[in-house]
Regions:
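Transmembrane beta-strand segments that form the barrel wall of outer-membrane beta-barrel proteins
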Residues: 1, 7-17, 27, 38-45, ...
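A generic structural signal for short, solvent-exposed coil/turn residues
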Residues: 2-4, 30, 74, 115
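Glycine-rich loops and low-complexity Gly/Arg-rich segments
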Residues: 4-6, 34-40, 95, 148-152
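Short glycine/proline-enriched turns and hinge-like loops at secondary-structure junctions
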Residues: 6, 21-23, 134-137
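Short, glycine/acidic-rich beta->alpha junctions
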Residues: 18-23, 104-105
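Contiguous hydrophobic, core-forming segments of folded domains
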Residues: 21-35
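N-terminal "first-domain core" detector
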Residues: 31-40, 73-78
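Flexible, glycine-rich linker and terminal segments associated
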Residues: 46-83, 87-103, 108-110, 114-124, ...
Length: 220
């Protein structure tokens, strides 16, 4: 909804992973104006525990969570921008980064710098800082083809300024995490050991050895 020099909005999403049969609902809110975007998102699982293809003897389900995002550009040099994101997810063993680093109620802060020399291309460099000194450094080059613009407009550096205005960004996608973050838990596996050969008289009792088995790939 437009309010003069700024825009507010609400959105809902249904995320579904065909390969794992996981579903998640997302609710978001945004506040945009010239050279500034602010977004907030809430993620809530719709499916429960399923066998995990990532870790042996583990189950997985979508993790509940939320994030806050802010992105801005310099009015005097709209090609240069910066992003700041805070994200928080809940669960005892959540793979916010990867399955080798499962964490309890993990959170992370992401900072990015972007440079758009012309509308067709954006170069980015960022750092995602999590708990326990865990971090990721990312570099990327993104190409965005807009069918409403001519090739000359998409390669014109002067056209970048219009992209940073409220009118120029009204068709942009909302900012959210489209990847479903998963929570894991270890299944209880019971092993019963039987002797290879049993000898005795009728009516005799023999003990069975029962133990918890811990086999398969484990998280680091």
């Amino acid at each position: 909804m437009f309010h003069g020099d700024y825009m507010t909005g609400l959105n809902t999403f249904l995320d579904y992973d065909l390969s794992r049969d996981h579903a998640r609902m997302g609710i978001g809110a945004e506040f945009w104006r010239d050279y500034l975007k602010m977004d907030a998102n809430l993620y809530h699982r719709l499916t429960n525990w399923k066998n995990s293809p990532d870790l042996d003897d583990y189950e997985e389900r979508p993790a509940d969570g939320w994030d806050l995002r802010m992105e801005g550009w310099l009015p005097s040099y709209p090609q240069l921008g910066a992003k700041l994101e805070y994200e928080q997810y809940y669960g005892n063993q959540v793979a916010l980064f990867d399955t080798d680093h499962l964490q309890s109620n993990p959170r992370a802060v992401t900072t990015d710098l972007t440079w758009t020399p012309f509308p067709l291309m954006t170069v980015s460099a960022g750092r995602r800082q999590g708990q326990n000194s865990h971090f990721e450094t990312e570099f990327g080059v993104n190409f965005t083809l807009n069918p409403d613009l001519t090739w000359q407009q998409q390669t014109d550096p002067a056209a970048v300024a219009a992209m940073r205005t409220l009118a120029g960004s009204r068709h942009d996608f909302v900012e959210r995490n489209n990847n479903i973050v998963l929570e894991y838990r270890k299944k209880t596996v019971i092993a019963i050991a039987l002797p290879e050969r049993v000898e005795g008289k009728s009516g005799m009792q023999y003990p069975l050895s029962v133990s918890h088995a811990h086999t398969g790939r484990q998280p680091a």
